A protein has these predicted regions:
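Terminal targeting/low-complexity segments that flank the catalytic cores of oxidoreductases
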Residues: 1-14
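Short helix-to-loop capping/linker segments positioned immediately adjacent to catalytic or ligand/cofactor-binding
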Residues: 9, 33-37, 92-98
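Short amphipathic alpha-helical segments with heptad-repeat character
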Residues: 11, 15, 50, 54, ...
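Acidic/histidine-rich alpha-helical segments that form the ligand environment
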Residues: 13-17, 23-26, 83-122
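Long, hydrophobic N-terminal alpha-helical segment
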Residues: 16-21, 25-35, 39-41
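Amphipathic, soluble alpha-helical interaction motifs
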Residues: 20-27, 59, 63, 70, ...
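Short, contiguous alpha-helical
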Residues: 33-84, 123-167
C-alpha cells in the first residue's frame, strides 16, 4: 500500500493533467495541421493522443468503480482502436477531446479521494491481454493512470519540439 502522502501527490498529478495538457497544446486551432502530423508512424498523432486520453479516463473509471463495487470483477482487455472507433475520438475536434478529458478527469478525482484505505487493495481481473492479464488492484490502476498520462505528455512534448515540426 502506498503511503498517504504518495496518494496525495499522485492525486494532485492526476488533477493537474488537464491543465498541463492544455498548456502544452495551447495555441493550436482545431484546423492546425499539427494535430494530424505523425512524426513516428507507429505512434499517435496529437489529435489521437487527446482522444485516447479522454477515452481511457472512461475505461479506467469503469475498472476502478467495478473493483470498488463488485467482488473480483473481470474486465476484458479491449483494443485501443476499437474504443476510438466507437467514440470517434481519433477524428474528433481536439477542443472537444480536451474538454471531454477535463470533464471526465475532474469527475474521477472525487471518486478516488473517497476511497477508504482497504478499498485501494481490492482487485479485479484483466482477461485477454497478452501482457497485463491477471489481478490488478485499484491502487495499481491509480498508478497506471499517472504513468499513462506521463507517457503521452512526454510524447506530446517530443512531437512539439522544433525538430519534429519540420517536414
Amino acid at each position: 500500500m502506498l503511503a498517504s502522502f504518495v496518494h496525495n501527490f499522485v492525486l494532485i498529478t492526476l488533477e493537474s493533467t488537464p491543465d498541463v495538457l492544455e498548456r502544452l497544446l495551447d495555441g493550436a486551432a482545431d484546423a492546425d495541421p499539427v494535430w494530424d502530423r505523425r512524426p513516428d508512424p507507429a505512434r499517435f498523432t496529437l489529435r489521437e493522443i487527446v482522444g485516447h486520453l479522454a477515452d481511457w479516463n472512461g475505461v479506467f473509471m469503469e475498472r476502478i468503480t467495478r473493483i470498488r463495487d463488485e467482488e473480483s470483477p473481470d474486465s476484458v482487455a479491449r483494443k485501443v482502436e476499437d474504443i476510438a472507433r466507437e467514440s470517434g475520438s481519433f477524428v474528433a475536434a481536439p477542443a472537444d477531446s480536451l474538454a471531454r478529458f477535463r470533464a471526465t478527469r475532474l469527475a474521477m478525482i472525487p471518486i478516488l479521494r473517497a476511497l477508504e484505505p482497504n478499498q485501494w487493495e481490492r482487485t479485479g481481473n484483466i482477461v485477454g491481454h497478452p501482457v497485463a492479464s491477471g489481478a490488478v488492484s485499484i491502487e495499481s490502476w491509480f498508478v497506471q493512470i499517472a504513468g499513462h498520462d506521463g507517457y503521452h505528455l512526454q510524447q506530446i512534448a517530443q512531437w512539439l519540439k522544433p525538430t519534429f515540426e519540420k517536414e
